[in-house]
C-alpha cells in the first residue's frame, strides 16, 4: 500500500526565503511569557496539610541544599520541627518563619535515577498533633546525561563517591 501512495504525493520544487529578517517581525523567534517562573522551585498545595515541592532535574549520586518557601499554614506555629521519622535521603536543616510563610532549607541526596519523591513531616514544638506533609519531587538523571541546570533555590553541596567494581584493588583469595 505504501508503494501505491508513493506516486500521489506532491513534491516541493523550490523553497523561498524572506529577503530581510527584522527582529520585530520575524516569526522564527521564540518569545516566552514574562510571567513564567520555570527557573524556581515550585511549591503547590495538594490539600490542607500537604505540599508538593518540585525541585527539577538533579544528578545521581549528588547532594543538594534546597531552599523553598511554604505559604502561611494555620496548622503550624512559629516553633516548627521535623517529626521523629526521618527520611534517609531528605534531611531538614532549618525552618524559619518569614512574612510570606516559612523558609524551609533541607538537604536532598539523589540516590537513584528517575522521578523520586521523598517525604518529611513538619510538626509544632508545642506538642499538638497537627503536622504538615512536605513531598519533595526530583527528576534524577544518571551520570551519563550531563549536568542539569539547577533551579533557583537548589545548590549542589557535594558528590557521593561512586563505587565501580572493575577498579577494585582486591585480588581475591590465594
UniProtKB/Swiss-Prot annotation:
Compartments (UniProt record): Secreted
Gene Ontology terms: cellular component: extracellular space
Keywords from the named record: Acetylation, Phosphoprotein, Secreted
Chief site of localization: secreted
Pfam families according to UniProt: DUF4517 (PF15006)
GO terms, molecular function: protein phosphatase 1 binding
InterPro entries according to UniProt: ADISSP
Function: Adipocyte-secreted protein (adipokine) that acts as a key regulator for white adipose tissue (WAT) thermogenesis and glucose homeostasis at least in part through activation of protein kinase A (PKA).
Family under the similarity heading: Belongs to the ADISSP family.
Protein name: Adipose-secreted signaling protein
Source species of the chain: Bos taurus (Bovine)
Gene coding for it: ADISSP
Amino acid at each position: 500500500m505504501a508503494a501505491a501512495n508513493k506516486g500521489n504525493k506532491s513534491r516541493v520544487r523550490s523553497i523561498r526565503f524572506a529577503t530581510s529578517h527584522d527582529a520585530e517581525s520575524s516569526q522564527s523567534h521564540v518569545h516566552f511569557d514574562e510571567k513564567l517562573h520555570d527557573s524556581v522551585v515550585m511549591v503547590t498545595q495538594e490539600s490542607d496539610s500537604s505540599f508538593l515541592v518540585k525541585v527539577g532535574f538533579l544528578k545521581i549520586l549528588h547532594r543538594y541544599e534546597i531552599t523553598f518557601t511554604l505559604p502561611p499554614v494555620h496548622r503550624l506555629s512559629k516553633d516548627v520541627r521535623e517529626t521523629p521519622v526521618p527520611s534517609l535521603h531528605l534531611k531538614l536543616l532549618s525552618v524559619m518563619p518569614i512574612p510570606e510563610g516559612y523558609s524551609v532549607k533541607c538537604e536532598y541526596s539523589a540516590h537513584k535515577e528517575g522521578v523520586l519523591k521523598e517525604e518529611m513531616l513538619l510538626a509544632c514544638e508545642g506538642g499538638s498533633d497537627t503536622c504538615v506533609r512536605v513531598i519533595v519531587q526530583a527528576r534524577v538523571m544518571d551520570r551519563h546525561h550531563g549536568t542539569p541546570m539547577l533551579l533557583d533555590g537548589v545548590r549542589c553541596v557535594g558528590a557521593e563517591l561512586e563505587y565501580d567494581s572493575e577498579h577494585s584493588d582486591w585480588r581475591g583469595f590465594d
